[in-house]
């Protein structure tokens, strides 16, 4: 999963972390049938936390050798598991097929509140290649420092640009520069700040 380079010695190599075995099950390099290798990760200063696009769980490693899996499945998505992509068919068709499947996007660590944000993209029949697909809805799964799900919020399409976001002292900022948003202005970069709301027990 990761490569390393020692800038003092010039040594380079690969870490011992590997994709889950399910990703190697039916790959066929001869006939170009491969899994989507998309990976997102964040670092807490102690652990590297890994999210795969077609995998419900996240993986945590403190030594780049051993990993522990934690459930991070969206309640809005069906079970996500690796689907083979056929490299012999049209790229656009492959993208449309993938767009209909449960999929996880980026993973972010909030050092101020010690939580993680995992973005889940809702399946959509109208995914277009080379587009941000502004109509697509998404959700954000929130996990605590022990990698337990503590909440999830769903966001509508045509409102936010989920790929434009960052963590600040006040909360999670998500851009409203969605081209389908009625308030969209290409001359202004607008973000909305979202904060955690804890329910009283």
Model-derived features: positions:
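Loop/turn-rich, solvent-exposed surfaces of beta-rich toroidal or solenoidal domains
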Residues: 97-145
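C-terminal structured domain segments
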Residues: 138-180
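Hydrophobic beta-strand positions that form the internal "hydrophobic ladder"
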Residues: 48-49, 116-118, 172
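Loop-centered beta-sheet repeat module
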Residues: 1-61
């Amino acid at each position: 999963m990761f490569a390393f380079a020692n800038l003092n010695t010039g040594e380079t190599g690969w870490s011992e972390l590997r994709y889950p075995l399910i990703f190697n099950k039916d790959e066929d390099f001869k006939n170009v049938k491969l899994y989507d290798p998309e990976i997102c990760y964040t670092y807490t200063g102690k652990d590297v936390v890994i999210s795969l696009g077609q995998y419900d769980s996240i993986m945590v490693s403190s030594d780049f050798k051993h990993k522990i899996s934690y459930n991070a499945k969206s309640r809005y998505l069906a079970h996500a598991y690796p689907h083979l992509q056929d490299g012999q068919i049209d790229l656009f068709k492959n993208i449309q097929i993938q767009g209909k499947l449960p999929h996880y996007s980026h993973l972010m660590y909030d050092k101020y509140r010690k939580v993680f944000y995992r973005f889940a993209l809702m399946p959509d029949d109208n995914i277009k290649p080379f587009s941000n697909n502004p109509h697509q809805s998404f959700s954000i799964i929130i996990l605590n420092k022990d990698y337990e799900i503590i909440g999830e919020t769903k966001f509508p399409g045509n409102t936010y640009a989920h790929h434009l976001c960052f963590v600040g002292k006040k909360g999670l900022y998500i851009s409203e520069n969605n081209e389908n948003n009625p308030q969209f202005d290409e001359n202004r970069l607008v973000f909305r700040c979202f904060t955690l709301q804890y329910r009283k027990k």
